[in-house]
Amino acid sequence: MKPHFLAVALVSLVLSVAGAVPFAQAPGPRPDTVDLAAIQLIKDEGLQRSQVMDTAWNLTEVFGPRLTNSPAVRAAAEWAARRLTGWGLANVRQETWGPFGRGWANEMFTATVVAPQPFPLIAAPRAWTPGTNGPVTADIVAPNIRTDQDMAAWSGKLDGKIVLLGAPVDVRPLFTPLGRRFTGQELADLETQPINAGRGRGGRAGGPANADFNQRYMQYLAKEGVVATIEPASGRNDHGAILVTGSPATYRDTSPPVVTPQIVIASEHYNRIARLLAGKVPVQLELNVRNRFFDQPLDAFNLVGEIPGTDRADEVVMLGAHFDSWHAGTGATDNAAGSAVMMEAMRILKTTGLRMRRTIRLALWTGEEQGLLGSRAYVKQQFADRDTMALRPGHAKLAAYYNMDNGTGAVRGVYLQGNEAVRPVFASWTEPFNNLGMTTLSVRSTMGSDQVAFDEVGLPGFQFIQDPVEYGTHSHHTNMDVFDRLQAEDLMKNAVIVAAFAYHTANRETLLPRKALPRARTAETR
């Protein structure tokens, strides 16, 4: 769905402007100067000759899902490096970090119920799980094992079976659309300061014990000779979408615990099977899963490239997005969209020939989906150790890090990560894009992506506020995260905005204001 206001905004986006003028600002810190002539060049290149969708298409449909340390992510990175080099970026390279662990790829997957009536399943294997060593047909059972006593009672009865894990999912009808834009009220709410009114709700007791039982249960199923396990999708997405990530079995261990093939299926299909079994109707499944592990190399990498600066080339502005994805779809909204936008922003800046005083560096991370591993390794090597807060020389030289990882939606503003001092600066840089819907500066911090790796060591790391579109409702980590979910106009506009922010950060007289340095994590645990 592409609202009419976006088409109108894009028609009016390229304006004939020139010169550098400061924007009006309420009394307080002096606003930054905005180079409108540079913005005009950036808009013209980014909206008239964009390559962002071609980049996204290559990442998603030519190379497919880009699981960390898989052959596909390495092939995609080699292609991206060639593209960046062809655009004229300097120092394009893969920087190794790790060790990460084994690579993995699914090479074949079919799952069809063959009795009592045949129907194919919407399903996918969990990453880093084994295959079936060829096609198998087996009865499905629902033992409902919850305790060690249950395991003892079922011992010897599960050999050659396929086991259901978990209860049926309550699938709700859709009374609201899957895709949406932020409303004015929602954006206004983001600008308010969050208040912690109390201690909050404590964590649920028994978590570690449950995790320990689950690990023992999976090993028990493998020992009992179970053919495979089947579990429902999370219930968050439903309606044909399945959310699939990795196995609890570690990818870091070259000799991990033996587990069975693990399959995630659509909630509707899971519920049908569970109801048949509850009605004493036998169910048989034909399954063929071919998964492959790659034990070399065990180290992963980040892809880096630069546009060198001039008189302040030792100072750096960074743009980043995670390059890795999960595997059920092709990693389009999460996060080929962000990677393509950041690559396109670099192309725009290089093609326009604009002069940047500071070096602009692009970093495409891997290991984000496993816990910001690539970006945290880079920050520790280049800037600071988050545990001890021992600073490296590069810490004082980073002007800012800008991250893109909120799907395909249009940029509506910036999360300031609690850095109120940067508000007047960003207000000036945002104003030329107000008519495109970029109006919001939220003091709130947003978590869960690579800007956190910078923010947690006191560096100015920022994430853009983006329209949700279908990100949390349909595409995030699902089999539906494919090229068709991408919104071309939004990605084109986002690349222009990122390029403008990078340009102004690179040419600002001083570095962006920073928050106070956080305490060392080791000190907090004493």
Language-model features, listed with the residues they occupy:
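Bacterial N-terminal signal peptides
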Residues: V8-A20
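Disordered, low-complexity segments in secreted/periplasmic proteins that are enriched in proline
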Residues: F23-R30, A197-P208, R236, R526
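Noncatalytic luminal/extracellular "stalk/propeptide" segments of secretory-pathway proteins
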Residues: A26-A38, W57, E61-G198
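N-terminal capping segment at the start of a domain
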Residues: T33-S70, A241-I242, D324-S325, A400-G409, ...
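Second-shell loop/turn segments in exported
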Residues: I39-L47, E61-A72, A138-N144, A152-A153, ...
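Metal-dependent peptidase/peptidase-like ectodomains
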Residues: P116-P120, N133-A138, G156, G160-I162, ...
